């Protein structure tokens, strides 16, 4: 974390109920809230969906309630919360020749999928802190390219020479390099121009383009597509989020004047495997 932030306290805890962690809030200049169980940790059932919801919506409610117990002068000035680009509706079916080329900015309405409702409710709990005089930022994040995480799962088929596009390959995928994501979070802590929802992405590319670029970065072919039916058989409902997408664009970051270190997909992938 850059030295200009001063003292940084990292807290790893269960946010389902108040506890000793609340002491770290008093006098903090900002809170960066990244809690949430991995969406792709396991196949979804009713219990897993509840875990995903509790680890985001309920945890954020508990956090804001803890902030409310502080004296106004001791409250954080900013709450920077994670959110997801899945906030937006699915694009039309991939058979549509255009597959929804319309750019999606932060002003777009939420969707009605499970993750869209989850992100909507998650953000609503964070935005409740505004009533306490706290500036709230919700980072609607796409795929983050960096060591581990989503990229590690994406590269495995390519390493085995069986990588390729998913489904039609026409679905849009918003992406950002991990270093740029961190820089945006750091800026949001102190820069008051960051407020409300922020599309945390560099741009969006077609899934087929992402697969081709990933194969190039790994020195592997990208010739074997993954059929939609096979993905649905393996992942169930979660597959819909890989087979559909929206052309999410970072309108607010552009307006603020954010500068990306890795503006091109090829460059971002080349610096994502260290």
Question: What residue ranges belong to the model's regions?
Answer:
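C-terminal amphipathic/interface module of NAD(P)-dependent oxidoreductases
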Residues: 240-274
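Alpha-helical substrate-binding/gating segment
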Residues: 127, 155-164, 170-205, 274
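Catalytic helix-loop patch of NAD(P)-dependent Rossmann-fold dehydrogenases
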Residues: 54, 58, 93-138
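Glycine-rich "substrate-gating" loop/helix at the edge of Rossmann-like oxidoreductase active sites
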Residues: 110-115, 140-148, 168-176, 189
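Glycine/proline-rich active-site loop of Rossmann-fold NAD(P)-dependent oxidoreductases
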Residues: 120, 132-134, 145-153, 188-198
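Conserved Rossmann-fold NAD(P)-dependent oxidoreductase catalytic core, especially the SDR/UDP-sugar
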Residues: 49-51, 61-113
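Mid/C-terminal beta-alpha module of Rossmann-like enzyme folds, strongest
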Residues: 191-237, 270-274
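NAD(P)H-binding glycine-rich loop region in Rossmannoid oxidoreductase-like domains
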Residues: 2-59
């Amino acid at each position: 974390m850059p030295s200009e932030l001063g003292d940084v306290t990292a807290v790893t805890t269960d946010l389902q109920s108040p506890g000793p962690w609340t002491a770290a809030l008093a006098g903090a200049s900002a809170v960066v809230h990244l809690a949430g169980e991995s969406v792709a940790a396991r196949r979804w059932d009713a219990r897993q969906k509840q875990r995903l919801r509790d680890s985001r919506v309920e945890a954020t409610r508990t956090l804001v309630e803890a902030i409310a117990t502080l004296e106004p002068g001791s409250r954080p000035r900013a709450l920077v919360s994670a959110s997801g680009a899945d906030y937006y509706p699915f694009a039309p079916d991939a058979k549509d020749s255009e597959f929804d080329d319309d750019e999606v900015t932060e002003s777009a309405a939420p969707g009605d999928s499970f993750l869209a409702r989850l992100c909507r409710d998650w953000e609503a709990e964070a935005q409740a802190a505004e009533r306490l005089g706290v500036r709230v930022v919700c980072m609607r994040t796409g795929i983050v390219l960096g060591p581990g995480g989503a990229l590690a799962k994406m590269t495995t088929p390519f390493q085995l020479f069986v990588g390729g596009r998913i489904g039609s390959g026409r679905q849009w995928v918003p992406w950002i390099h991990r270093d740029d994501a961190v820089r945006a979070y750091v800026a949001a802590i102190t820069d008051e121009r960051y407020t409300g929802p922020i599309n945390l992405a560099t741009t969006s590319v077609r899934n087929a383009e992402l697969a081709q670029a990933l194969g190039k970065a790994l020195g592997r072919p990208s010739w074997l597509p993954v059929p939609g039916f096979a993905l649905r058989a393996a992942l169930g409902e979660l597959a819909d989020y890989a087979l559909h997408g929206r052309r999410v664009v970072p309108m607010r970051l552009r307006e603020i004047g954010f500068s990306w270190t890795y503006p091109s997909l090829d460059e971002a992938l080349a610096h994502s495997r260290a």
